[in-house]
């Protein structure tokens, strides 16, 4: 143990919490929600604290591993029916849950895991006739989130999609990394 180590860790955790749920991110989320009122949206966070904080600020239902099975089923049923157009979650929807009704995902914060990110992308890409899906990833400028996001986007799932968009004319020369 180093002197000041505990203080350094607390400072790092505080910086990370601020980056994960900043006022700027909340404003962007709110803007996306306002512009997409008819869509079903899943908002992903890195941890329960961030999910609960956002849920309280935005008055939205939150699903975490602490949510009891019956309540989780109720939330998902209400989401599928459209009664709840938005769900906030930390990691509980990363794997094994089909929600083809979701057409937009917003990653407010996440881990450095490419697998987690691809799983989250998979939540909104589930097949449904005529469906188009969008995934927004919000990163705080000047933080480690930028580096982690850049690294994740090198995954072959993104490369294949970029190539498809390029061939269809959605991406022009010089825009491949945007």
Q: PLM features: residue spans?
A:
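Conserved nucleotide-binding/hydrolysis micro-motifs of P-loop NTPases
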Residues: 49, 68, 93-94, 110-114, ...
């Amino acid at each position: 143990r180093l002197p000041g180590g505990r203080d350094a860790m607390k400072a790092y955790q505080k910086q990370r919490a601020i980056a994960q749920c900043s006022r700027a991110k909340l404003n962007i989320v709110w803007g996306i929600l306002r512009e997409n009122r008819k869509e079903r949206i899943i908002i992903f966070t890195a941890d329960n604290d961030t999910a609960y904080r956002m849920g309280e600020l935005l008055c939205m239902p939150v699903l975490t591993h602490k949510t009891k099975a019956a309540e989780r089923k109720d939330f998902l049923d209400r989401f599928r029916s459209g009664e709840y157009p938005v769900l906030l979650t930390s990691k509980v929807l990363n794997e094994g849950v089909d929600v083809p009704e979701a057409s937009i995902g917003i990653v407010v914060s996440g881990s450095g895991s490419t697998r987690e990110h691809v799983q989250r992308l998979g939540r909104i890409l589930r097949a449904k006739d005529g469906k188009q899906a969008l995934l927004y990833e919000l990163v705080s400028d000047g933080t480690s989130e930028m580096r982690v996001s850049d690294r994740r986007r090198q995954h072959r799932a993104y490369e294949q999609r970029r190539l498809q968009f390029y061939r269809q004319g959605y991406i022009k020369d010089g825009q491949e990394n945007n």
